[in-house]
From Swiss-Prot:
It catalyses: 3-O-[beta-D-GalNAc-(1->3)-beta-D-GlcNAc-(1->4)-alpha-D-Man]-L-Thr-[protein] + ATP = 3-O-[beta-D-GalNAc-(1->3)-beta-D-GlcNAc-(1->4)-(O-6-P-alpha-D-Man)]-Thr-[protein] + ADP + H(+). It is a single-pass type II membrane protein. InterPro entries: Kinase-like_dom_sf, POMK, Prot_kinase_dom, Ser-Thr/Tyr_kinase_cat_dom. Protein O-mannose kinase that specifically mediates phosphorylation at the 6-position of an O-mannose of the trisaccharide (N-acetylgalactosamine (GalNAc)-beta-1,3-N-acetylglucosamine (GlcNAc)-beta-1,4-mannose) to generate phosphorylated O-mannosyl trisaccharide (N-acetylgalactosamine-beta-1,3-N-acetylglucosamine-beta-1,4-(phosphate-6-)mannose). Phosphorylated O-mannosyl trisaccharide is a carbohydrate structure present in alpha-dystroglycan (DAG1), which is required for binding laminin G-like domain-containing extracellular proteins with high affinity. One of its GO terms (molecular function) is ATP binding. One of its GO terms (cellular component) is endoplasmic reticulum membrane. The lineage of its organism: Eukaryota, Metazoa, Chordata, Craniata, Vertebrata. The gene is POMK. Residues 1-19 are cytoplasmic. One of its GO terms (biological process) is protein O-linked glycosylation. The keyword Phosphoprotein does not apply. This is Protein O-mannose kinase. It is found in: Endoplasmic reticulum membrane. Its EC number is 2.7.1.183.
């Protein structure tokens, strides 16, 4: 009697399907983390430029536009001969600013307006020369005897116009919590750079209200931030017992740090000689207010604020010694960005399963 071959259909045990799904989830999460690592590394380095010199040229030279070769900073003679003023685009307490042209490139000329403020102007030039980096507007040349500075032109202007810029159709895609948080990270990176600069610990004094603070920075066409005005950057030197005061007048308002306000009450007239000096932690006090401006009121910005609540509360400690350093704030901002991008990507990962 012949035996018939029996073909038995074998199903996977019920437990194997969940195991396979779990394996797929682990692979997807690992892949997501790898992509996130590369993405964030590109973002943090895409302001792109190393701390030393934005155009990768030797100190005292620059590259502009598509030109491959580095040019030395323009001298008095070169500025007078090769740079053509187009129009006045701004005027502050110290200098007047002109949109200009050099070899078919738009550039900016800044010139002293009041001779009695020449020390402030020359201090700003000294800082600009010494602090050239990815955080600082690019210096193209200068003429001390004519009180003239030549810098790179950024058509989007100062940060005061950020919200208006983000409502231009061309830039509406940038109006997201992610891009706005990246701007806040750029800002804190600049404060961190100033507090640990090659010259020592520098305090951003030209920032007694939000509008004034924003006017010190430029928005680049690729949506990064550069500090532009360095006229008021006093040096803190703890080892020598040297603290600073931002000017010689009384400061008011909630934007400035408590230690910057007159401590002896309204009954005692302000006297600069009696005003106690302070350190760089005044800049830390202002970070939450500036970042709140950056975050705006777009979808997701309140979630970002929630994640930043603790570090911002620490920035607002009345005792300056209890406030975090700029590096600690920067580290927290970057961690929050990483966390929120990962959380935003997770729904897509779940859909894959």
């Amino acid at each position: 009697m012949e035996k018939k071959a029996h073909f038995v259909k074998r199903d996977f045990p019920p437990r194997e399907a969940p195991s396979l799904l779990l394996l797929l989830l682990v692979v997807a999460v690992l892949l997501l983390n790898a992509l996130l690592y590369l993405y964030l590394g590109n973002l943090h380095g895409s302001s792109g430029r190393a701390d030393a010199e934005p155009s990768l040229c030797p100190y005292g030279s620059f590259k502009l536009g598509p030109v491959k070769n580095c040019s030395p900073w323009l001298s008095c003679e070169a500025i007078n001969r090769e740079v053509r003023k187009l129009k006045c685009v701004g005027e502050g307490a110290v200098k007047k600013v002109f949109l200009s042209e050099w070899k078919e490139n738009k550039v900016v000329i800044s010139q002293l307006t009041k001779p009695e403020l020449k020390e402030d102007f020359l201090h700003g030039l000294k800082m600009l020369k010494a602090l050239q980096s990815k955080h600082v507007v690019r210096l193209l040349g200068y003429c001390e005897k004519q009180f003239t500075i030549l810098t790179e032109y950024h058509p989007l202007g100062s940060l005061r116009g950020l919200n208006e810029t983000l409502h231009i159709p061309k830039y509406k895609s940038m109006n997201t919590w992610h891009r706005r948080l990246m701007l806040a990270i750029d800002y804190v990176s600049i404060i961190r750079y100033l507090h640990s600069s090659p010259l020592g610990t520098l305090v951003m004094c030209d920032s007694n209200d939000l509008d004034k603070a924003l006017s010190q920075y430029l928005l680049t066409s690729d949506f990064h931030i550069l500090v532009n005005d360095l006229d008021a950057l006093p040096l803190v030197n703890r080892s020598a017992g040297r603290l600073v005061k931002c000017g010689h007048r009384e400061l008011w308002g909630e934007f400035v740090a408590p230690e910057q306000r007159w401590p002896y009450g309204e009954d005692v007239p302000f006297d600069d000689d009696l005003m106690p000096p302070y350190d760089e932690k005044t800049d830390i006090w202002k970070i939450p207010d500036v970042s709140n401006f950056f975050l705006g009121h777009v979808e997701g910005s309140d979630i970002v604020r929630l994640h930043l609540f603790d570090i911002h509360a620490a920035c607002k400690k009345k005792d300056p010694a209890e406030r975090p350093s700029a590096q600690e704030v920067l580290d927290t901002y970057k961690k929050v960005l990483t966390l929120l991008i990962r959380e935003a990507a997770m729904p897509s990962t779940r859909e894959m399963l």
